[in-house]
Amino acid sequence: GNFDENLVYVNDIEIFRPLLVRNAQQEGLSFINSDMVGDIVFSSGGFDAKYGDKMSSVLDIRYKKPQEFGGNVSLGLLGASLHLEGLIGSRFTYQFGYRRKTNKYLLNSLETQGEYNPTFNDFQVYLTYDINEKSELAFLGNIADNKYNFIPETRETSFGNFYEMLKLKVYFDGKELDRFSSLFGAFMYTYKPKKDLVLKLITSAFSTGERVNYDIQGQYYLSETGLGFGDDEGLERGIGTYIEHARNNLWANIYNIEHKGVKIYDNGNLSWGVKYQYEFIEDRVNEWKMVDSSGYSIPSLPDNIGIFDSVFSPQLNNVFKSNNAIASSRLSAYVQKQWIFSYDYGQWYANLGLRAQWWDYNKEFVPSPRASLSFKPNIKQDILFRFACGMYAQSPFYKELRDEKGNVHSDVLSQKSLHFVLSSDWNFTMLERPFKLMSSVYYKHLWDLNPYYLDNVQVRYMAKNNAVGYARGLDVRLFGE
């Protein structure tokens, strides 16, 4: 899936990610701080009903509870990090992590040459306090401040085939100044009235302010490279200028409260949960682009500069202006039951769950049934086989509601997928070290898709459920020490 189609959890808390960010170049630091991680579970599909409403995959992270004092410091050309952990008395544990990163040296290898100055800063804290033998209180906090400053200079690209190779060279003026700042905090109260019953209450808040500003002029020169037969090297094909302008600002506040529970039986367990989420998003878009070919601003198709076709209605320039504010509420709930059947030849695990969600903005209610069957044979090898299937509905977030011109559409529905996944987990020892091989084969039928295109690695949606598709593949991962 793309940047928006994957779930990320830390200690049962769903993590939100920037909305305007351009994937890979500007994301910088992911939320996950590897120094604080105790366990990782990843599923490329067919995940349980207890996980949320995304189409593609889920990454479930568990931050550890330290048993003693420790820490580490890392320094390098691409950044630095500091991590401290420990406990105070027998009830209170803490983890602190600070990270600073720059990928300017990596970005300097891109086709667009210039002065890249991205800086990403992140501070996280995870605290736990054992109130008594039955109760625990935990806090997870994060402060992130990401800046992406870029002054482009030149870009050179070659394309075509053996008989006609073309070279495009662009000289730039201007710069881009982006900033993404966010605050995240979550409290989790865990209560165990009995050994076979666990109850959790989770509340969290996420606030982000995102700014994308740029004024960039590019003067381009298109020529032949002379690699084909009989071509004149350096023959000019065309010159022109284009200007891109943006003043985009977005503010988002997301609050939620959630209850989860697990009842353990001799032959399985029962899990349930219910969640309420309130969102307020304010967005201001002011973008335009002008293309000037040889001194003339002529109407043209976006993908065929200088070619006019009266069948279409091309725009003289691309102008996106909007001022949107959305307040909405979401409700979701799930219940799932696991059965364990033991025989002489092995153990069977059956899991059946139902998840449902409702959003008051588009008035859509979507149920999502999910099921899985696993088998662990009684043999010397520690191996588990699993088949899973289910329906997954990704309710649109603000980004999916906004079309390429900045207009917001309230009739956009959830994107839906049907998963079929066959997987295996094999734990073994090699070179006197523990290893784990995880593999899966999957097929996903997709419908009510909201098409998007990549604009300089930024995902821009069409805000229409007018596509179908599929995803299929083989996923193999090897873990070792």
Q: Residues of each region from the PLM?
A:
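Short acidic/polar hinge/loop motifs at secondary-structure boundaries
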Residues: I13-F42
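Structural signature of Gram-negative outer-membrane beta-barrels, strongest in the C-terminal barrel
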Residues: A252-I254, N267, K275, V319-H445
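Transmembrane beta-barrel wall of Gram-negative outer-membrane proteins
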Residues: L78-R100, Q113-I151, E176-A205, Y265
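Transmembrane beta-strands of outer-membrane beta-barrel pores
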Residues: G46, Y63, L77-G79, R100-K104, ...
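Outer-membrane beta-barrel transmembrane domain signature of Gram-negative proteins
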Residues: D231-L235, E244-Q347, N466, A471-G473, ...
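Flexible loop and strand-edge segments within Gram-negative outer membrane beta-barrel domains
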Residues: E136-L137, G141-K192, S207-D232, H245-L250
